[in-house]
């Protein structure tokens, strides 16, 4: 079975293919926004399918894949099909709070999804009272003994970005970001100076390195298109260009807003 027009095969837990040398299987957490490398996100889990996912990986310190749903694709056994890229997530500050599981998601390596493994059960709407994971497992374990409540992906890692960050290019990107922050501060009549903004940005991004590039991208790339392109990027310049064009758009938008309110 193929996922829509994408060349992404879909399997169930009884017909998982032999993996290629570079492939691994990871749980997929499908959300409505991407997490980029070096970015962080506080998570609250209450659905049984994702509680099962965390049970499967937390004790062994394994990652899962953070992906975003693709609205142009048909659902997979009641679950949204994701775009074909994502990031591996390492879990930190894991804790239970009542019936919820809380943790800090840390964005790591990028990956591409080659195939999907569908969940053993179609998700149901349970209002505010959820059944236990064990109760749901009992519904499918005889037919799909290796099944899971969540979608899994057969993935391969995307290589690190190639190239070096040019210092002048980096300084220009930071200057654009500072200009944007200055305009926002003026619109909101915030009591900050250009020096305050300059120091804050320089402290956040002290040196032009790949980690800093991804952190800057996480602040600026807020559209699905830009985030997807960054996750598929092969070299540093591609990400720099995405950052530059998106800051320019933001600056143009807030300038128009300010002019319309003068």
Regions found by a protein language model. Name each.
Residues 2-262:
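N-terminal low-complexity, acidic/polar interaction/targeting segments
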